[in-house]
Amino acid sequence: MNKEERAKRQSKIRNFSIIAHIDHGKSTLADRILEKTNALTQREMKAQLLDSMDLERERGITIKLNAVQLNYKAKDGEEYILHLIDTPGHVDFTYEVSRSLAACEGAILVVDAAQGIEAQTLANVYLALDNNLEILPVINKIDLPSADPERVRQEVEDVIGLDASEAVLASAKAGIGIEEILEQIVEKVPAPTGDSEEPLQCMIFDSLYDPYRGVIAYIRVVNGTVKVGDKVRMMATGKEFEVTEVGVFTPKTTQRDELTVGDVGFLAASIKNVGDTRVGDTITHAKRPAAEPLAGYRKLNPMVFCGLYPIDSARYNDLRDALEKLELNDSALEFEPETSQALGFGFRCGFLGLLHMEILQERIEREFKIDLITTAPSVIYKVFLTNGEDMIVDNPSNMPDPQTIDRVEEPFVKAAIMVPNDYVGAVMEICQGKRGTFIDMQYLDETRVTLTYEIPLSEIVYDFFDQLKSNTKGYASFDYELIGYKPSKLVKMDILLNSEQVDALSFIVHRDSAYDRGKVIVEKLKELIPRQQFEVPIQATIGNKVVARSTIKAMRKNVLAKCYGGDISRKRKLLDKQKEGKKRMKSVGSVEVPQEAFMAVLKMDDN
C-alpha cells in the first residue's frame, strides 16, 4: 500500500471497547456485533464467543481481554474497519480493562435497563475518561419486564454526567438496536491519529505463548508500519527479533502482509523467552527506532499474597513452568519460591484480589493438571521496630517477635458500595464488623444509595464480598481503591498442633478480634483433623500466651477385653501400660493436616 491508500484506510478505522458491570450483557452484545458484521458463519457462532476460556464460559464472566477485527458497511455506503476489544467487568480485572482502553479511541458503555448504574460501571467509566475516550451510552435489556430505560437514562446523566439523550436503547439478546450502535461507532468514535511514515511504535496490550510459534504479542499500531521480515526491538528490554508473521483476529487468526496505523492485531517473531515481551512495552524498528516509548500503563501491584504448594512435591518444577506461562499474559501476577516446614517447596504468589487468586488456582489445576494446597491469603504490612528500623511483611511467618515491634501499619481501601435502600442497615453492619469507618452516603435516586467506607484491605480479603452478596440478596455492588497505610493494633496468631507450630496456619489478626478468631479456628481444626492414636492438643497462641485450646481425643483399644473378672490391680497394670505407650507415641508422632483445614482458616465466618 502507498501512503494515500494507507491514509484513506486509516480514516475508516474505528477502535472501540465495551465496558459494563458484570452481567449487564457485554459478551452477548459482542456476539451480536460479530453476527451483524458477518464475522462468522452461522455454524461457527456460539454464545459468548469471545470468552474462549472454559472458566469464563462456566462462570459467565470475562477474564482475559480479546480483540477482533470486523468489516462493516455503513449506511453512508462506505466500508469501515472496526476493532472490538472485549474487556472484563470484575473489580479484580480492572488492569485488563485499562489495557484494552489504552488501545482504543471509543468505548460503548453498557448499562442494564433494570438495574441501572453499578459500582464497577463507574470505575470503568472513569478509566475510559482518563484515556480520553469517546463514550457511547447503551441501555441494554430493554425487553425485560422490569426495564425502566428512562430512569436509567436520567441516572447516566446525573451520576456520570454524560449526555444520554442519544443513548441507544437495545436488547443484545433479542438483537434490537445493534445497527444503531454500529452507526454511532462510525459517526462518533474518532479515527486513529498517527502517521504511517513515522518510526514504528506498537503497544503490546497482551501476549500468549504458542508452543510452535513462540510468544505471540497482541499489538495496537500507533505510528509507522510493520511487515514480515522487519527487524524489531522491544524498547523496555532492548532485545531484537525478526518478525515471522503479522495478522489480525477475525476471531480466527488471519495472516496479513503488514499492519499499519490504527491496526489491532498480532505479531510473532519466534520469541522464545516469555520475559522478553512485557505487556505495556513498545515495539519499534531496530534500524529506525522511535525516539521514545509510548506512555505504557503502570505496572499493577498485587494486593493479596498467598502460598501455592503442589500436593505432590515432585511437581514443584511443573508448578514453576505453569506460573511462568500464566504470568506471560497476566501481567499482575507475581511469584517467588518459598518453603514451609509443613508443606515443603512452593511459591509465594501475589494477586490483585480474591477472585483473581481463585481463578488462577483453578487455571493451574485445569490447564496444567497440578493439585495445589493454598495457604491463607495475607496483605502487605509495614512493621516499625523499636530500634528504628522498618520492614515489609507479606507472609505472617516473617512477622518479628512482638517485643521488638513499635507499631504495625496495614493498607486501607476506600470502598464504594452501591446498594438498594432496604439493605443499607445490613451493609453498614457488615462494614462495622470489618473495622470499617463510615465516610459518606449519597442517594443515586429514590431507591439506591452509595455508601463510602474506609476498610482495612485484610478484612476485605477474606469473605467480605461473599457476605455482602448474601446479606443483600446479590443486589449490592462494590468497588475499592487503595488509599494508603494506617497504624492498627495487629498481632500474629500461631496455631500449635501437639505443641508444634504449623507455619502455614499462622495469620495476622486485629487484637480485638484475636480471641474469637482463635476460638473458632481451634474448634474448626478439631472437626477437620482426623483422630490419632494419641491425644492432640490444638492451641492458638499470640507470642507465648495461649488464647484458645481444644483437644482431639485419642482413639484407644479396649485393653481390658481379655481380662475376665480379674483383680483391679491387674486391670490397672494393663491400663497404665497402654498409657505409657500413648505417651511415647505422642512424643514421636506427627499430625497430618488435611487440605480442608487450610481452607477452613481461609473461609472464616465471623458469625
UniProtKB/Swiss-Prot annotation:
The keyword Acyltransferase does not apply. It catalyses: GTP + H2O = GDP + phosphate + H(+). It is an enzyme of class 3 (hydrolase). It is a peripheral membrane protein. The keyword Nucleotide-binding applies. Residues 11-193 form the tr-type G domain. Its EC number is 3.6.5.n1. GTP binds at D23, H24, G25, K26, S27, T28, N140, K141, I142, D143. It is found in: Cell membrane. It holds the Pfam family GTP_EFTU. SUPFAM superfamilies: EF-G C-terminal domain-like (SSF54980), P-loop containing nucleoside triphosphate hydrolases (SSF52540). Keywords: Cell membrane, GTP-binding, Hydrolase, Membrane, Nucleotide-binding, Protein biosynthesis. Required for accurate and efficient protein synthesis under certain stress conditions. May act as a fidelity factor of the translation reaction, by catalyzing a one-codon backward translocation of tRNAs on improperly translocated ribosomes. Back-translocation proceeds from a post-translocation (POST) complex to a pre-translocation (PRE) complex, thus giving elongation factor G a second chance to translocate the tRNAs correctly. Binds to ribosomes in a GTP-dependent manner. This is Elongation factor 4. It comes from Bacillus anthracis (strain CDC 684 / NRRL 3495).
